[in-house]
């Protein structure tokens, strides 16, 4: 007797197939093969800074912010992955935004969490969040948290540029949630707090009487601590990173790294959905893999990251992404510093994060 193929063993009668179809039902062995394929084709990818720079310069020449439609008054070039055409990954959005001298990117707020990592900044370039002006110096990281008013004001004489990083793909696509969004009635929100206010509420020294609101802002509920507006000075971050390199042993996979913490808790992740770290690499790292997405911005230096059979050769200001479950390691040419971005907190929230060496 000839051995039957699995498909023949699972073959249903025409009547059974019709019955299931009429009632919008499918057998498990047919639907399970469709799971996990929604974002098929997600690849390791890299965007070179010279290409990004040329693109944002061209957009700046062609499109004044004031000409953009309400709600989209942000001049941004968005890296899109080959296998996912809206963003760098299915959970993390990265964009490069510019504001010309004298321009304002008008105040708005949204349900997605966001941060700004300054590429070209100055004392006269400010992001205003929840009433405080935060100066945007090179490599400073500024949070613009969920449902907080924020606008970007360039009172200097040079174009400013920075990374926008949001959890928009996770919220809008993976979770299929509504994009809760609101424009402020003014282009520039009123500055109601002196510089340093939010640091005084959440920095090393805090008010004796804790009167700040700990609740999640806006029409949202949950169990995670809300992330406040905050500016992480690159001067302080780099100093601490150097201290680590002088006194500690490097992680075999990530080198010397510092996690940006939620100022309200003093612990990572910075947001419930995304975690960020500054990584100092001085030598080749050991290969590993994990089920979270890793995206990177090169702050200083050059080198290569090996992802499976691909080699991503990077230099200062390049952006690259590593898909889940791909074996990878970094190989800097001398010393390099990276900004690492990951959706690992999402997996950890479900006790589902996994990491291993090959």
From Swiss-Prot:
Q: Name one GO biological process term.
A: catabolic process
Thermal behavior of activity: Optimum temperature is 45 degrees Celsius.
Has UniProt tagged this entry with the keyword Nucleotide-binding? no
Superkingdom, natural source: Archaea
Q: How does activity depend on pH?
A: Optimum pH is 7.2.
UniProt keyword annotation of Oxidoreductase present = yes
Task: Name the UniProt key words of this record, in alphabetical order.
Answer: Aromatic hydrocarbons catabolism, Dioxygenase, Oxidoreductase
EC numbers? 1.13.11.4
Q: Which family does it belong to?
A: Belongs to the gentisate 1,2-dioxygenase family.
Function according to Swiss-Prot or TrEMBL? Catalyzes the oxygen-dependent ring fission of gentisate between the carboxyl and proximal hydroxyl groups at positions 1 and 2 of the aromatic ring to form maleylpyruvate. No activity with cathechol and protecatechuate as substrates. Part of a 3-hydroxybenzoic acid-degradation pathway.
SUBUNIT field: Homotetramer.
| Protein's name according to its UniProt entry | Gentisate 1,2-dioxygenase
Q: What species is this protein from?
A: Haloferax sp
Q: Which gene encodes it?
A: gdoA
């Amino acid at each position: 007797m000839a051995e039957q193929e699995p498909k023949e063993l699972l073959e249903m009668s025409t009547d059974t197939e019709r019955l299931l179809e009429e009632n919008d039902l499918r057998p498990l062995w047919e639907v399970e093969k469709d799971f996990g394929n929604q974002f098929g084709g997600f690849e390791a990818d890299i965007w070179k800074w010279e290409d990004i720079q040329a693109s944002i310069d061209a957009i700046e020449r062609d499109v004044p912010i004031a000409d953009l439609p309400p709600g989209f008054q942000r001049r941004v070039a968005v890296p899109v992955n080959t296998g996912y055409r809206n963003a760098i990954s299915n959970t993390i959005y990265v964009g490069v935004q510019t504001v010309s001298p004298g321009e304002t990117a008008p105040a708005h707020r949204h349900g997605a969490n966001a941060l700004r990592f300054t590429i070209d900044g100055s004392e006269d370039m400010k992001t205003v969040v929840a009433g405080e002006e935060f100066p945007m110096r090179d490599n400073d990281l500024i949070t613009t948290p969920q449902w907080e008013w924020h606008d970007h004001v360039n009172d200097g004489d040079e174009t400013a540029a920075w990374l926008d990083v949001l959890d928009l793909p996770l919220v809008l696509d993976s979770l299929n949630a509504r994009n809760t969004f609101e424009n402020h009635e003014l282009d520039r929100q009123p500055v109601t707090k002196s510089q340093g206010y939010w640091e005084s509420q959440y920095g090393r020294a805090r008010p004796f009487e804790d009167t700040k609101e700990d609740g999640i802002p806006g029409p949202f509920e949950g169990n995670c601590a809300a992330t406040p507006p905050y500016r992480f000075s690159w001067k302080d971050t780099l100093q601490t990173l150097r201290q680590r390199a002088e006194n500690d042993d490097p992680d075999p996979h990530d080198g010397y790294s510092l996690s940006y913490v939620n100022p309200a808790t003093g612990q990572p992740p910075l947001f419930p959905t995304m975690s960020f770290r500054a990584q100092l690499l001085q030598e080749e790292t050991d290969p590993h893999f994990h089920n979270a997405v890793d995206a990177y911005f090169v702050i200083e230096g050059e080198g290569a990251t090996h992802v499976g059979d691909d080699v991503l050769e990077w230099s200062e200001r390049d952006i690259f992404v590593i898909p889940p479950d791909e074996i990878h390691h970094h190989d800097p040419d001398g010393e390099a510093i990276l900004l690492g971005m990951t959706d690992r907190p999402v997996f950890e929230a479900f006790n589902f994060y996994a990491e291993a060496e090959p």
